[in-house]
Every structure is written in structure tokens, then in C-alpha cells.
Curated annotation (Swiss-Prot):
Keyword set includes Glycosyltransferase: yes
Molecular-function GO term, any one: anthranilate phosphoribosyltransferase activity
Protein name: Anthranilate phosphoribosyltransferase
Residues at which Mg(2+) 1 binds: S93, E226
Length: 338
């Protein structure tokens, strides 16, 4: 089918789409066969009614079928957030990814430029000197040689160009805010996945289970799409096909609570400077919150069994210079410098 109208009519009637219907609808959206008005109407019908697990699974299946893929080790992990929390923090997942790579776990990081903040992962890494517009072979080399590779979302999801203008005109969150982090081009099966609202914790864990993930922690920390050290982080953890929920506090990571202002960042250049300070030995709230996210990621990766052990290994990665070396190698390989 190449006509969105039947799916639009069903969504507008507040009826849920089946997984297969959702995939067909998103195939139409992302192949340029729907008008801007149809795209906007369909996305808002889903948003107002509330997207279902089956609809998200179908939409992700469509996105994954069209993306430019990257080869990565089977045990690679991604640390990624949906964005949309409007918090303007430092690039926590970026530093956490480098720490995890320095600890010996391959990272296939997926990200984009900022949408609701001043600096997304892509802005931060570009300011650090990482080349973004590279092909799958170079990214695979980055993962193999640096322990971490960055997949710039717009390079891997070209079909999104068909819905981009409608999303901009709508000016509000749509299902696509959720789909990017669920569509990792390296097909990772282990993730630390931050979400902008706690309402999505369990539903996205269910989505990842249905899509075949092995271990995923979906987290929301005190308004952030990260594990936070400002207060309580809520977690829905997918492990061995089962989902459990729990909470984490700064004390669980052995760090002192901070306030949001302590981890507020700036643009890509400012955040790059802050990241370099931590690599240089600065002991501050940015270091603490990044270590916390890295520690959880090391548990998810199966590298350690406890958060405590994860914090120990993450701190070793940072303090030994292994994290800085991972960044240096990522910059060199992405720029194809021998």
C-alpha cells in the first residue's frame, strides 16, 4: 500500500494501529509518498492519542530497514538519550561513552546535533575534533581501534528527510523523538537509554524486548534523559527477557548529590572544554555524573556485576588516561590520520 489515508483515518479515530500497520504507515512516510499535511496530521493523531508499544515497534522496524548500517562487535553498547528534556546539561553520555571505551567495552554511539539544547553529542564531538561525516568503514575502524565510534544520525537515516520539514513546522514532540535512539545503525543489543519523561520507561523497555535487545536500562533522572546525581533516577531494566523497575540515588554511586546548575553546560565548544577539564583531572559534578552513567553502562555490558565495581572501573579508565586515549584515537581515526 502506498496511501497513508487509511492509517491516518484509523489514527484520527483514536484506534491503535497494529505492528504491521504501523510499519506500513512509516514505510509510506519515509519513502516520500505522503504529503506534508498527511504527515503532520498522522504524527499529531498519534501524539494526541498516545503512541502504543506496537506502533513504536512497527515504526522502528521501518526505520531500521532503511538505515545505513555499521559493522560492530556483538558486545558493543550504546549510551544515548532521546533529548527533549530542555535541561541544557553537559554532554554526559558522550563522556560516559569515552570512559566505557577506555574500560575496554566497545561503544557504537548514535547521536545527533542539538534539538532542544545548545549542544548535542554531534556538536560536542565536532568541537573536540571528531569528524562526523564519515562512512561505515571508518566508523567500524574507530570502534576497533579507539574502542568507540560515532554514528551521526543524519548520515544513517536519510529517509528522515521526507518527514523533517513537517516535524519542524509542527514544532512539538512526535514519535520520531523516540525512534532515533531505538534505531542504532550498528544493531547494538545493549543500551543505556535515557528518556525525557518517566511515562516512557516501561513502554520503551517493552519495545526493546520485542525488538530483540539483550540488556537495556531505560532511565529518567530528575527531569533528565540521563542517570542523574541531582536526585533519584527511575529505571526500567530489560534483562534476560524480563523487565524490572527500581530507583538509583547518588549514594548508590558513592557520590555527593549536586544541583542542576552544577552540571549545566553551554554550546559544543564550551562543553568540549569542560570535558577536556575532566580528562585533565578535574574533580567536579560533571565527572561524578559521567562516572555514574559509565558505571551503569559497564553493568549493562556485563563487564562488571555491580554499580560499585562499575564506578571503580570507570574511575580507573578516567584516571589512568585510558579515556583520554580513546578520544585521541577516535579523533585520529575519524580524520583518517595514521
Amino acid at each position: 500500500m502506498t496511501d497513508l489515508k487509511p492509517f491516518l483515518a484509523k489514527a484520527a479515530s483514536r484506534e491503535p494501529l497494529t505492528r504491521e500497520e504501523a510499519r506500513s504507515a512509516f514505510d509510506i512516510l519515509m519513502s516520500g509518498q505522503a504529503t506534508p499535511s498527511q504527515i503532520g496530521g498522522f504524527l499529531m493523531a498519534l501524539r494526541v492519542r498516545g503512541e502504543t508499544v506496537d506502533e513504536i515497534v512497527g515504526a522502528v522496524a521501518s526505520m531500521r530497514s532503511k538505515m545505513l548500517t555499521v559493522e560492530a562487535p556483538a558486545d558493543a553498547i550504546d549510551i544515548v538519550g532521546t533529548g527533549g528534556d530542555a535541561s541544557g546539561t553537559y554532554n554526559i553520555s558522550t563522556l560516559a561513552a569515552l570512559i566505557v571505551a577506555g574500560a575496554g567495552v566497545p561503544v557504537a554511539k548514535h547521536g545527533n546535533r542539538a534539538l532542544s539544547s545548545k549542544s548535542g553529542a554531534a556538536d560536542n564531538l565536532a568541537a573536540l575534533g571528531v569528524k562526523l561525516d564519515v562512512g561505515p568503514e571508518i566508523i567500524s575502524r574507530c570502534i576497533a581501534e579507539a574502542g568507540v565510534g560515532f554514528m551521526f544520525a543524519q548520515m544513517h537515516h536519510s529517509a528522515m528527510r521526507h518527514v523533517g520539514p513537517s516535524r519542524v513546522e509542527l514544532g512539538t514532540r512526535t514519535i520520531f523523538n523516540l525512534l532515533g535512539p531505538l534505531s542504532n545503525p550498528a544493531g547494538v543489543r545493549r543500551q543505556l537509554l535515557g528518556v525525557f519523561s518517566p511515562q516512557w520507561l516501561v513502554p520503551l523497555a517493552e519495545v526493546m524486548r520485542d525488538l530483540g535487545s539483550e540488556c537495556v536500562w531505560v532511565v529518567h533522572g530528575d527531569g533528565l534523559d540521563e542517570i542523574t546525581t541531582t536526585g533519584i533516577t527511575k529505571v526500567a531494566a530489560l534483562e534476560d527477557g524480563k523487565i524490572r523497575t527500581f530507583e538509583l540515588s547518588p549514594a548508590d554511586f558513592g557520590v555527593s548529590p549536586c544541583v542542576l546548575a552544577d552540571i549545566k553546560g553551554g554550546d559544543g565548544v564550551a562543553n568540549a572544554a569542560a570535558l577536556r577539564e575532566v580528562l585533565g583531572g578535574a574533580k567536579n559534578a560533571y565527572r561524578d555524573v559521567s562516572l555514574a552513567n559509565a558505571a551503569a553502562s559497564l553493568v549493562i555490558a556485563g563487564k562488571v556485576e555491580t554499580i560499585h565495581d562499575g564506578m571503580t572501573l570507570a574511575a580507573q579508565s578516567l584516571d589512568s588516561g585510558a579515556t583520554a586515549l580513546a578520544l585521541d584515537k577516535l579523533i585520529a581515526v575519524s580524520n583518517d590520520i595514521d
